[in-house]
């Protein structure tokens, strides 16, 4: 990056106007001034008395390289000649009380490996990208009418080396990306990778928003990781936290000794739930810092999306003893989304929001917040409560499985089976399932079948694909040894087949956000806890029939209404022996019966497996073919003979 300095108009703009390339002004930039090579340092510290740059190059002497205050509103700058890359540094800030505090650079592009906390001078330009084809293809697609299966991942605990050390960005590219491609995931969502001091914050309590964490390597190493993802056709989404930040002494908290990036009002400054500080989203300098940061990750790291963390915490704050909406946050989120989509109209901006705030995914010009996706937390909570209930009692909470369809089209939803649900004593998805060993696996297969056939894009946390038995342990890697056990191998095979089926079946994603894409066949069979529905694609004849049985009872010749009087094939049955099931499948082509049922034109009689999902597809034949004419005649003959009987 080339520094933009000595431009008073541009510096003043940072305080009063939109300045979305503030990373070009602030931070440490290699520069040539008056023919001399060195580094230009620029920082915002509005209430500092004095400021200097310190590091190994001056033996951390705050009196040697004092900075100049270049705007009345508190921008400080200094050019230091003959400093090179990889030098470490901090700002020594003299507060209004005369105390000297050391702070890392808010705009630093790299930092020391924890537990050290200094910033590192590094020019991140120069990586040669190879993902033009990825972006060319992405522009031709509508994000809403494509399959989306997201693999949520914590970089430090997916897999570790035998000695317990972490894989680097480049090593993870070799290990993880082929694995994801083999499992047919379309995107990876990585828990925050901004620099953060505490491993167990999972990255959600950051100190260096412009610095990809040095735990796993350098900025160019992470660029390589993203580049490789794109080569394999996998999009990269980052968790991003613009609502609050950690209070470690070297970070943003009380940056110049007074509230700078956080609110001055003590009522709303502190985030008491997480022990962090809330960003002052009404302050122009803070908005420019955050929105520039989003665009920085897009520009320099070719990121495809953000999952914006804790939106509910931003939208509402507790003021004067009661919860109120935060209009600063509302305005900020709208401005953020407008800026992002002006840069890339196909970018993924996902709100992690558990509230009923209206129009989260509506455009700002329609009064919305401007996101294009929202996590469906209500679906997740209802479905998991239903699955955790003993099967014989599920009929009493039947509505938990049907309620989501009443609001499924109010937003562009992603269905999340996320990290939050498999940690802190909540158990793994597999262990949430009631019953014996076999029943747990059967019900998890059933849950995944329902998950992939319900309207909405999909997100699954790592380990769920093979039935991780223990809940997530963030200091350890996944239990890869489970592949030694037959049922886990079967689960893994089932998951790969299910997600492959999802990706090649347009009815399961083409009309995710249209009422036309879903129709109940039977939503009211609570006594048997069986649900059946139709998923539809753009083409009228592109349909799938889904039947889910949430009890252990097997039903023979169970009647299911179907929209067309024709033949149907069972294209997936979670009870197949190959998946660890009992083998109650429908091998033969199913002949529909012309008698209407479930308000449908016809019906089929099928075997309903225990704790199973069955997916049927109409048999398609070329119009006017002899084979088709013969099948129609056979169907008519069967219908006639039944009427005669």
Swiss-Prot record:
CDD domains: AmyAc_Glg_BE, E_set_GBE_prok_N
Enzyme class: transferase
Biased composition (Basic and acidic residues): 626-635
GO biological process per UniProt: glycogen biosynthetic process
GO MF annotation list: 1,4-alpha-glucan branching enzyme activity; cation binding; hydrolase activity, hydrolyzing O-glycosyl compounds
Keyword Ribonucleoprotein annotated: no
Active site positions: 309, 352
Signal peptide extent: none
UniProt-recorded name of the protein: 1,4-alpha-glucan branching enzyme GlgB
Native source organism of the sequence: Bacillus cytotoxicus (strain DSM 22905 / CIP 110041 / 391-98 / NVH 391-98)
Gene name in the database record: glgB
